[in-house]
Amino acid sequence: MAGAKEIKTKIASVQSTQKITKAMEMVATSKMRKTQDRMAASRPYSETIRNVISHVSKASIGYKHPFLVEREVKKIGILVISTDRGMCGGLNVNLFKTILNQIKNWKEQNISTDLGLIGSKGISFFRSFGFNIKGQLSGLGDMPALEELIGVANTMFDAYRNGEIDAVYIAYNKFVNTMSQKPVVQQLVPLPESKDDHLNERQQTWDYLYEPEPKVLLDSLLVRYLESQIYQAVVDNLASEQAARMVAMKAATDNAGNLINDLRLVYNKARQASITNELNEIVAGAAAI
């Protein structure tokens, strides 16, 4: 059994680690709440744009934007959103598994894939697989700006316009609640129909006057909508990261507490054994006299 002094040193070390994990848990909780607020604030914007796009595209303007036209799919581009930092449980691993399974399914259909990567964890992971990476970005921090994301996003959209890829998907961790984050791979381009599109079909298409003309408006709105979807996904993933880190750090803090209790028990037993030995020596010495 280790000596009492050595055990006491271990207890102090674990207590120091526990303070760090507790602080990280509190920081993650605060950041998660702030990110949730940004996430909630951005949703109405993208939903409103989506409804207007649906209305304009259904109008008889004799124009179909390339982002609305389905084509034969031979190659797909995936915009992967991961974290820059670790200590967030299996968040990234679960997302990467989902992406690899989807890529495998497409490969069985003779569909190849290109990647655009946001987040250092995704960059380091997918580089090792030899994928064709069309663009990458890392170091966004806790408050990403849309201007920082546009470069990688435009790389994928330009490839779609030029016919290099036939569809663009986005993969990220969707924030469900504090205890649940769901990895999703969803289509961005061609723009899939939403549930509201069928409702909009019942509405008359001549009850609005558009300024500028519908074609110019549609071109502009589609770009804004896709940018908002990417930003929403990044914020969603960030909220998922902070929630996963909060849970992981709470588990680490609780485990540290359990370990401290176990070490204290061992420490008390070691002290008891030491005291017993000292008493035995005193008794033996007294008997010898």
Swiss-Prot record:
Signal peptide: none annotated. Keywords: ATP synthesis, Cell inner membrane, Cell membrane, CF(1), Hydrogen ion transport, Ion transport, Membrane, Transport. PROSITE patterns: ATPASE_GAMMA. It is found in: Cell inner membrane. GO terms for molecular function: ATP binding; proton-transporting ATP synthase activity, rotational mechanism. Its main location: membrane. GO terms for cellular component: plasma membrane; proton-transporting ATP synthase complex. Gene3D superfamilies: 3.40.1380.10, ATP synthase, gamma subunit, helix hairpin domain. Produces ATP from ADP in the presence of a proton gradient across the membrane. The gamma chain is believed to be important in regulating ATPase activity and the flow of protons through the CF(0) complex. NCBIfam families: ATPsyn_F1gamma, PRK05621.1-1. HAMAP family: ATP_synth_gamma_bact (MF_00815). F-type ATPases have 2 components, CF(1) - the catalytic core - and CF(0) - the membrane proton channel. CF(1) has five subunits: alpha(3), beta(3), gamma(1), delta(1), epsilon(1). CF(0) has three main subunits: a, b and c. Belongs to the ATPase gamma chain family. This is ATP synthase gamma chain.
